[in-house]
Amino acid sequence: MSLTVATWNINSVRLRIGNVERYLRLRKPDVLCLQETKCPDEFFPHLAFEALGYTHRLVQGMKSYNGVAILSKVPFTATTIHHRCGKEDCRHIEAALDLGGDPILLDNLYIPAGGDIPDPDENVKFAHKLDFYREMAKWYAGHKPRPRARKGLRRIAVGDLNVAPLEHDVWNHKQLLKIVSHTPVEVDLFGQMQASLDWIDVPRRFVTADRKLYSWWSYRNNDWRVSNRGRRLDHILATPALSGAISGHRIDTDLRDWEKASDHVPVMATFDL
Protein backbone atom coordinates (compact mmCIF):
# COMPACT_ATOMS: atom_id res chain seq x y z
CA MET A 1 0.00 0.00 0.00
CA SER A 2 0.99 3.62 -0.50
CA LEU A 3 1.07 6.33 2.16
CA THR A 4 1.34 10.03 1.31
CA VAL A 5 2.19 12.48 4.07
CA ALA A 6 2.22 16.25 3.54
CA THR A 7 3.30 19.12 5.76
CA TRP A 8 2.37 22.79 5.44
CA ASN A 9 2.82 25.87 7.60
CA ILE A 10 -0.51 27.42 6.74
CA ASN A 11 -0.14 30.67 8.73
CA SER A 12 -3.76 30.62 10.03
CA VAL A 13 -6.00 27.71 9.13
CA ARG A 14 -9.20 29.74 9.34
CA LEU A 15 -7.88 32.53 7.14
CA ARG A 16 -6.65 30.05 4.52
CA ILE A 17 -9.19 27.24 4.86
CA GLY A 18 -10.09 27.66 1.18
CA ASN A 19 -6.49 27.07 0.16
CA VAL A 20 -6.22 24.00 2.37
CA GLU A 21 -9.41 22.53 0.90
CA ARG A 22 -8.14 23.27 -2.61
CA TYR A 23 -4.82 21.58 -1.88
CA LEU A 24 -6.48 18.50 -0.41
CA ARG A 25 -8.67 18.14 -3.48
CA LEU A 26 -5.65 18.63 -5.73
CA ARG A 27 -3.12 16.28 -4.12
CA LYS A 28 -5.28 14.07 -1.89
CA PRO A 29 -2.58 13.19 0.66
CA ASP A 30 -3.48 10.48 3.14
CA VAL A 31 -2.24 12.69 5.96
CA LEU A 32 -1.76 16.46 6.14
CA CYS A 33 0.15 18.06 9.00
CA LEU A 34 -0.41 21.78 9.52
CA GLN A 35 1.64 24.25 11.53
CA GLU A 36 0.86 27.77 12.69
CA THR A 37 -2.85 27.05 12.69
CA LYS A 38 -3.35 30.04 15.04
CA CYS A 39 -6.68 28.65 16.14
CA PRO A 40 -8.03 27.58 19.54
CA ASP A 41 -9.25 23.99 19.46
CA GLU A 42 -12.90 24.96 19.92
CA PHE A 43 -12.82 27.02 16.71
CA PHE A 44 -10.92 24.56 14.52
CA PRO A 45 -12.79 23.98 11.19
CA HIS A 46 -13.38 20.26 11.71
CA LEU A 47 -16.41 20.04 9.43
CA ALA A 48 -14.46 21.16 6.37
CA PHE A 49 -11.97 18.34 6.80
CA GLU A 50 -14.61 15.78 7.73
CA ALA A 51 -16.35 16.52 4.42
CA LEU A 52 -13.13 15.79 2.53
CA GLY A 53 -12.63 12.42 4.19
CA TYR A 54 -10.13 13.44 6.87
CA THR A 55 -12.10 11.77 9.61
CA HIS A 56 -9.19 11.28 12.01
CA ARG A 57 -7.84 14.51 13.47
CA LEU A 58 -5.54 15.61 16.25
CA VAL A 59 -5.33 19.33 16.93
CA GLN A 60 -3.66 21.51 19.50
CA GLY A 61 -4.05 25.22 19.04
CA MET A 62 -4.13 28.60 20.67
CA LYS A 63 -5.29 32.08 19.74
CA SER A 64 -3.09 34.06 17.32
CA TYR A 65 0.08 31.98 17.63
CA ASN A 66 1.58 28.57 16.91
CA GLY A 67 -0.75 25.56 16.70
CA VAL A 68 -0.41 22.15 15.04
CA ALA A 69 -2.87 19.70 13.50
CA ILE A 70 -2.76 16.22 11.99
CA LEU A 71 -5.58 15.54 9.50
CA SER A 72 -5.75 11.93 8.38
CA LYS A 73 -7.71 9.44 6.32
CA VAL A 74 -5.77 6.75 8.18
CA PRO A 75 -7.00 5.78 11.66
CA PHE A 76 -4.92 6.49 14.75
CA THR A 77 -4.10 3.82 17.30
CA ALA A 78 -2.85 6.41 19.78
CA THR A 79 -2.23 10.15 20.03
CA THR A 80 -0.01 12.28 22.24
CA ILE A 81 0.29 16.00 22.87
CA HIS A 82 3.81 16.92 23.92
CA HIS A 83 4.87 19.99 25.89
CA ARG A 84 8.43 21.05 25.19
CA CYS A 85 10.84 23.17 27.22
CA GLY A 86 8.34 23.49 30.03
CA LYS A 87 5.87 25.37 27.82
CA GLU A 88 2.36 24.49 26.68
CA ASP A 89 2.67 26.40 23.42
CA CYS A 90 1.24 23.98 20.85
CA ARG A 91 4.34 22.88 18.97
CA HIS A 92 4.49 19.06 18.97
CA ILE A 93 1.81 16.42 18.53
CA GLU A 94 2.20 12.74 17.72
CA ALA A 95 -0.11 10.13 16.20
CA ALA A 96 0.36 6.41 15.63
CA LEU A 97 -0.99 5.53 12.18
CA ASP A 98 -2.86 2.23 11.89
CA LEU A 99 -1.64 0.68 8.64
CA GLY A 100 -1.63 -2.93 9.73
CA GLY A 101 1.15 -4.48 11.75
CA ASP A 102 3.28 -2.14 13.80
CA PRO A 103 1.97 1.43 13.56
CA ILE A 104 3.95 4.23 11.98
CA LEU A 105 4.62 7.00 14.47
CA LEU A 106 4.14 10.50 13.05
CA ASP A 107 5.45 13.67 14.69
CA ASN A 108 4.14 17.07 13.64
CA LEU A 109 6.54 19.78 14.80
CA TYR A 110 6.54 23.56 14.77
CA ILE A 111 9.95 24.51 16.12
CA PRO A 112 10.36 28.13 17.30
CA ALA A 113 11.50 30.58 14.64
CA GLY A 114 13.98 32.17 17.04
CA GLY A 115 13.50 35.89 16.50
CA ASP A 116 16.01 38.09 14.69
CA ILE A 117 19.15 38.15 16.86
CA PRO A 118 21.18 34.91 16.74
CA ASP A 119 22.47 35.24 20.29
CA PRO A 120 20.81 33.27 23.11
CA ASP A 121 22.14 35.71 25.72
CA GLU A 122 20.45 38.66 24.03
CA ASN A 123 17.40 36.94 22.57
CA VAL A 124 15.17 34.65 24.64
CA LYS A 125 13.39 33.45 21.50
CA PHE A 126 16.65 32.20 20.04
CA ALA A 127 17.56 30.55 23.35
CA HIS A 128 14.17 28.81 23.33
CA LYS A 129 14.80 27.53 19.81
CA LEU A 130 18.19 26.08 20.73
CA ASP A 131 16.75 24.47 23.87
CA PHE A 132 13.93 22.97 21.82
CA TYR A 133 16.39 21.33 19.44
CA ARG A 134 18.47 20.00 22.31
CA GLU A 135 15.39 18.54 23.96
CA MET A 136 14.21 16.90 20.73
CA ALA A 137 17.62 15.34 20.07
CA LYS A 138 17.71 13.88 23.57
CA TRP A 139 14.12 12.67 23.38
CA TYR A 140 14.55 10.99 20.01
CA ALA A 141 17.81 9.37 21.13
CA GLY A 142 15.84 7.76 23.93
CA HIS A 143 13.59 6.08 21.35
CA LYS A 144 16.39 4.60 19.25
CA PRO A 145 15.95 0.83 18.80
CA ARG A 146 18.64 -1.54 19.94
CA PRO A 147 21.16 -2.44 17.21
CA ARG A 148 20.00 -6.05 17.06
CA ALA A 149 16.29 -5.30 17.13
CA ARG A 150 14.51 -7.39 14.53
CA LYS A 151 12.23 -4.58 13.50
CA GLY A 152 13.44 -1.01 13.34
CA LEU A 153 11.44 1.95 14.50
CA ARG A 154 9.02 3.20 11.83
CA ARG A 155 8.76 6.91 12.48
CA ILE A 156 8.19 10.02 10.35
CA ALA A 157 8.80 13.57 11.58
CA VAL A 158 7.45 16.51 9.61
CA GLY A 159 6.91 20.19 10.07
CA ASP A 160 8.25 23.69 9.99
CA LEU A 161 11.58 23.06 11.70
CA ASN A 162 12.73 26.65 11.05
CA VAL A 163 16.26 25.64 10.07
CA ALA A 164 17.67 25.47 6.55
CA PRO A 165 20.56 23.09 7.27
CA LEU A 166 22.35 22.72 3.94
CA GLU A 167 24.26 25.23 1.82
CA HIS A 168 21.72 25.05 -1.00
CA ASP A 169 18.74 25.18 1.34
CA VAL A 170 19.13 28.97 1.26
CA TRP A 171 19.45 31.46 -1.56
CA ASN A 172 22.88 32.68 -0.42
CA HIS A 173 24.86 30.55 2.00
CA LYS A 174 27.52 33.14 2.90
CA GLN A 175 25.08 36.01 3.41
CA LEU A 176 22.81 33.94 5.64
CA LEU A 177 25.42 32.46 7.97
CA LYS A 178 24.59 35.17 10.51
CA ILE A 179 20.85 35.10 9.85
CA VAL A 180 18.55 33.09 12.11
CA SER A 181 17.58 29.77 10.47
CA HIS A 182 21.01 29.16 8.88
CA THR A 183 23.53 29.98 11.61
CA PRO A 184 26.18 27.36 12.42
CA VAL A 185 24.77 26.70 15.91
CA GLU A 186 21.30 25.99 14.51
CA VAL A 187 22.66 23.80 11.74
CA ASP A 188 24.73 21.89 14.27
CA LEU A 189 21.73 21.27 16.53
CA PHE A 190 19.62 20.23 13.55
CA GLY A 191 22.37 17.74 12.75
CA GLN A 192 22.35 16.43 16.31
CA MET A 193 18.61 15.87 16.15
CA GLN A 194 18.96 14.20 12.76
CA ALA A 195 21.69 11.91 14.10
CA SER A 196 19.62 10.95 17.14
CA LEU A 197 17.55 8.50 15.08
CA ASP A 198 19.68 8.45 11.93
CA TRP A 199 16.88 10.38 10.25
CA ILE A 200 16.71 10.33 6.44
CA ASP A 201 16.10 13.70 4.78
CA VAL A 202 13.38 12.55 2.37
CA PRO A 203 13.36 15.40 -0.20
CA ARG A 204 17.15 15.29 -0.44
CA ARG A 205 16.86 11.63 -1.38
CA PHE A 206 15.50 12.94 -4.70
CA VAL A 207 17.10 16.39 -5.00
CA THR A 208 20.84 16.19 -4.38
CA ALA A 209 22.48 18.55 -1.89
CA ASP A 210 24.19 20.55 -4.64
CA ARG A 211 20.82 21.75 -6.00
CA LYS A 212 18.69 24.59 -4.65
CA LEU A 213 15.57 23.49 -2.80
CA TYR A 214 13.20 25.84 -0.95
CA SER A 215 9.82 25.74 0.79
CA TRP A 216 9.52 29.33 2.08
CA TRP A 217 9.74 32.79 0.49
CA SER A 218 9.30 35.97 2.53
CA TYR A 219 6.25 38.17 2.08
CA ARG A 220 8.75 41.03 1.80
CA ASN A 221 9.74 39.88 -1.69
CA ASN A 222 6.95 41.16 -3.91
CA ASP A 223 8.17 39.23 -6.94
CA TRP A 224 9.31 36.19 -5.01
CA ARG A 225 9.63 33.99 -8.09
CA VAL A 226 12.06 36.34 -9.84
CA SER A 227 14.22 37.05 -6.78
CA ASN A 228 13.88 33.44 -5.55
CA ARG A 229 15.32 34.30 -2.14
CA GLY A 230 13.98 31.18 -0.55
CA ARG A 231 14.86 28.85 2.29
CA ARG A 232 14.01 25.21 3.00
CA LEU A 233 12.45 25.41 6.44
CA ASP A 234 9.86 22.64 6.06
CA HIS A 235 11.06 19.08 6.34
CA ILE A 236 10.06 15.44 6.12
CA LEU A 237 12.33 13.01 7.95
CA ALA A 238 12.02 9.22 8.10
CA THR A 239 13.81 6.59 10.14
CA PRO A 240 16.02 3.99 8.42
CA ALA A 241 13.34 1.32 8.84
CA LEU A 242 11.35 3.23 6.20
CA SER A 243 14.27 3.81 3.85
CA GLY A 244 13.20 1.17 1.35
CA ALA A 245 9.63 2.48 1.34
CA ILE A 246 10.48 6.06 0.31
CA SER A 247 9.24 6.39 -3.25
CA GLY A 248 8.55 10.04 -4.02
CA HIS A 249 8.34 13.64 -2.90
CA ARG A 250 6.81 16.90 -4.07
CA ILE A 251 7.19 20.57 -3.13
CA ASP A 252 4.25 22.52 -4.54
CA THR A 253 6.01 25.78 -5.28
CA ASP A 254 3.12 27.13 -7.37
CA LEU A 255 0.94 27.43 -4.27
CA ARG A 256 2.99 30.46 -3.26
CA ASP A 257 1.13 32.27 -6.07
CA TRP A 258 -2.34 31.42 -4.78
CA GLU A 259 -4.55 34.20 -3.43
CA LYS A 260 -4.02 34.68 0.32
CA ALA A 261 -1.00 32.40 0.08
CA SER A 262 1.02 31.30 3.06
CA ASP A 263 4.70 32.20 2.84
CA HIS A 264 5.35 28.44 3.05
CA VAL A 265 4.32 25.81 0.49
CA PRO A 266 3.39 22.17 1.12
CA VAL A 267 5.99 19.42 1.11
CA MET A 268 4.81 15.86 0.50
CA ALA A 269 6.42 12.41 0.59
CA THR A 270 5.20 9.03 -0.62
CA PHE A 271 5.97 5.71 1.04
CA ASP A 272 5.26 2.33 -0.57
CA LEU A 273 4.73 0.09 2.43
List PLM regions with ranges.
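Active-site beta-strand/loop signature of hydrolases that rely on acidic residues for catalysis
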Residues: 5-9, 24-42, 106, 140-167, ...
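N-terminal, active-site-proximal structural segment of metallo-dependent hydrolase catalytic domains
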Residues: 1-52, 58-59, 65-68, 165, ...
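Soluble or luminal CAZymes and related metallo-dependent hydrolases
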Residues: 12-16, 87, 127-138, 144, ...
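Surface-exposed cleft-lining segments at the edges of enzyme active sites
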Residues: 111-134, 174-179
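Metal-dependent phosphoester-hydrolase catalytic domains
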Residues: 78-82, 166-273
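Short, solvent-exposed loop/turn segments at secondary-structure junctions
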Residues: 11-13, 38-40, 64-65, 76, ...
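Structured beta-strand-rich core segments of catalytic domains in phosphoester-bond hydrolases
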Residues: 37-40, 44-118
